[in-house]
């Protein structure tokens, strides 16, 4: 079964309450994918995602964490900290995006097919794909497809 690493923004947007048009659209796509499409995938997340969600405003974080209660956690493999540091050292991720580097390292090291996120600045960013491919090739790691829920909704979904 195809594997998907669930990054922090997915459960966060599922419970998002802001009403801007973009946020409303992302929330709807997240809920549609989670409620209908996720069953076709093997889902994983991490302690990093749970820790980030735990920092969310009261109520939202606990609801987002509850959404992940049955999702297995990926553990840190040997070399995890080195891979995370390598991404930052080689400017794939800025120094203040250590959590994003951790999500990417976990998804890569565990050979995830997809990394699902709404973080289009640091993760689902087409401008970073080639750079990530080069770095992961040097490390002997596969490159997960980094995408948003919109891209994993089947074309025949009504």
What are these regions (language model features)?
Residues 1-45, 54-63, 89-95, 129-132, ...:
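Short, well-structured N-terminal submotif of metal-dependent ribonuclease cores
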Residues 39-43, 69-72, 113:
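Short active-site oxyanion
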Residues 3, 17-21, 26-27, 110-158:
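Acidic, PIN/NYN-like endoribonuclease modules and their adjacent C-terminal/linker elements
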Residues 47, 77-78, 149-150:
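Residues at the C-termini of beta-strands that transition into short coil/loop
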Residues 72-130, 153, 158:
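Active-site neighborhoods of divalent-metal-dependent phosphate/nucleic-acid chemistry enzymes
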Residues 8, 47, 118-120:
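Short secondary-structure boundary segments
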